[in-house]
Amino acid sequence: VDAVGTACMLHSNIAAQYQSLRADFFAQPGVTRMTAAEHTEGDSRGTGAVGMVDAAAFRKNAGLKREVFGPFTLLVTCEDQEDLTRTLAGIEGQLTATLLGNEAEIQSASALVALLSEKVGRLLVNGVPTGVEVCPGMQHGGPYPATTDSRFTSVGTDAVKRWIRPLSFQNFPGGVLPPALKDDNPLGILRMVNGKMTTDPI
């Protein structure tokens, strides 16, 4: 990680907040700093950092469960599967979680999958969550405090639903309906009619 160098962050204030939180994490009891690279004061660039702590210390310290927005990783070491389960049960909502393993290993971890499904908005296998594609299948949200409303995504086709609400027009004459609802479909858009998606006029 030290050899990677720095990267420009989104804003100088974000870089300053990252530096502050990173320093605070490394000052916590039981946290071992695994990287040596330092951050340059006043610079908008972020330096990657890795810390390590054992699961018992992590569970006792709520401050270690905060998000550090930037190139920071905290490795939490667990003694066994029970220790891992206890630790994950105590974390709050997250945007993502990744499981690393082959198919047989993932199948044997069904209880872990079920636990993580309650904690995150996107669950990955052998992948990294940094690729946030704008597509219908993308879910970039999660239980609080990852987001304030876990029913929505902030990226992807469904993200627009954060800003709209359903409205039904019942028994309206066709001439006064909005264009998107007119029988002849003047906009040529895809609509659900009698349970089927179609662009055909009614």
Regions found by a protein language model. Give the residues of each.
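NAD(P)-dependent aldehyde/semialdehyde dehydrogenase
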Residues: V1-L95
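Serine/threonine-rich low-complexity intrinsically disordered regions
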Residues: D2, Q28, T35, N102, ...
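Extended hydrophobic packing segments that form well-structured cores
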Residues: L177-I202
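Generic signal for short, ordered secondary-structure residues
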Residues: V4, G63, G142-P143, P186
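Generic surface-pattern signal
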Residues: D2, T6, A23-G30, E118-G121, ...
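C-terminal core of ALDH-fold dehydrogenases
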Residues: E41-D43, Q81, R86-L177, M197-T199
